[in-house]
Amino acid sequence: MGFARLLHLVFSLLVFAGITNGLICPFDSIYQLGDSFSDTGNLIRLPPDGPTFTAAHFPYGETFPGTPTGRCSDGRLIIDFIATALNLPLLNPYLQQNVSFRHGVNFAVAGATALDRSFLAARGVQVSDIHSHLSAQLNWFRTYLGSICSTPKECSNKLKNALFILGNIGNNDVNYAFPNRTIEEIRAYVPFITEAVANATREIIRLGGSRVIVPGIFPIGCVARNLNFLNFFPDGDKDDLGCLSSLNNLSIYFNSLFQRALASLSIEFPQAVIIYADYYNAWRFLFRNGPALGSNSTSLLKCCCGIGGPYNYDPDRECGSRGVPVCPNPTQYIQWDGTHFTQAAYRRVAEYVIPGIIKALKCSYSNIQPFLREGEGRQALRLNERE
């Protein structure tokens, strides 16, 4: 039996056998906060420059739905697959007008940071005004909440069957600083980033949320945008996957603080279910096993949409720019544009993390839509696989 067939068999047993002692998930809505890995169309609606953002134009959205939506990919994101798995419609962005928010709202904004702009500016890190940071997204949520309930009790009742996803967020706080700040300088303010996310999680619970997923950040040393800065790192900094160890170690440090903060919150709010989603190891597993899962073995660190250099990435000629080509088959690529990933990659990461999330929420798999039966990405990733 081939490796990919074995992976698919193991995952199918996990998902479709069900957890007989679990409870049916009662979710009727999802609320998402985050950055470009979750934004389904907010940034492109933010004046004055949002409509000029690359994700507002083709080839973004070419795989799904066939036209740009503001998603930073050729198609769906992890949040889309989570919604589908829970039998809920895809989330509409908060800034989209004349749409239904009956089943939740997406407040995520591409480029958003966990820390406020003033904090980063004081440390010499410049962030555009257009990118709504985490506290601004929380303000949007408060405004929205005020439109559907008027008392704490009523709000708690409205949110009792809601799932909150906070992130991933925080990698932009690092990306905007790099390479103008050293790894040591960035590492020094990572605790402030994780504290900001923990405080946002605390606020969501105080406002009535009872089930919150907080994903860790991905291995930032594996994305083409950062690999393009290879000259800033000493020789030998690459690991066996070709990723930058210094940056990935920063992700590991970041995620360790995340998990510590969430453990403290679980003690502070014993009535809430707070889940850490291990995006880091999901992406590492995908990069390591990409060829067995359908990715082209020569393109694991290369962009599908891009041009130039060893990673098919040029920061001065972004995806969507005139003359920048797109690969003929995005399902064979993990990386989309140098910073973001393809729909096929997001699907596989979703397949990795969703079973663990559902188990932690004490839900039955029998209520989970088998999205992985559709289209590409049918090979599955084992739950909690470690290198």
Curated annotation (Swiss-Prot):
Pathway: Alkaloid biosynthesis; ajmaline biosynthesis
Enzyme class, UniProt record, top EC level: hydrolase
Sorted UniProt keywords: Alkaloid metabolism, Glycoprotein, Hydrolase, Signal
Reaction(s) the record says it catalyses: 17-O-acetylajmaline + H2O = ajmaline + acetate + H(+); 17-O-acetylnorajmaline + H2O = norajmaline + acetate + H(+)
Residues bearing glycans: N98, N180, N199, N249, N296
Superkingdom, taxonomy of origin: Eukaryota
GO molecular function: acetylajmaline esterase activity
InterPro entries assigned to the protein according to its UniProt record, in alphabetical order: GDSL, SGNH_hydro_sf, SGNH_plant_lipase-like
A GO biological-process term: alkaloid metabolic process
Keyword Hydrolase included in the entry's annotation: yes
E.C. number(s) listed in UniProt: 3.1.1.80
pH dependence: Optimum pH is 8.0. Half maximum activity is seen at pH 6.5 and 9.8.
Notes on temperature effects: Optimum temperature is 53 degrees Celsius.
Extent of the signal sequence: 1-22
Function: Acetylesterase involved in the biosynthesis of ajmaline-type monoterpenoid indole alkaloids (MIAs) natural products, important plant-derived pharmaceuticals used in the therapy of heart disorders. Deacetylates 17-O-acetylajmaline and 17-O-acetylnorajmaline to produce ajmaline and norajmaline, but is inactive toward other acetylated alkaloids.
Homology family: Belongs to the 'GDSL' lipolytic enzyme family.
Protein known as: Acetylajmalan esterase
Species the sequence originates in: Rauvolfia serpentina (Serpentine wood)
UniProt gene name: AAE
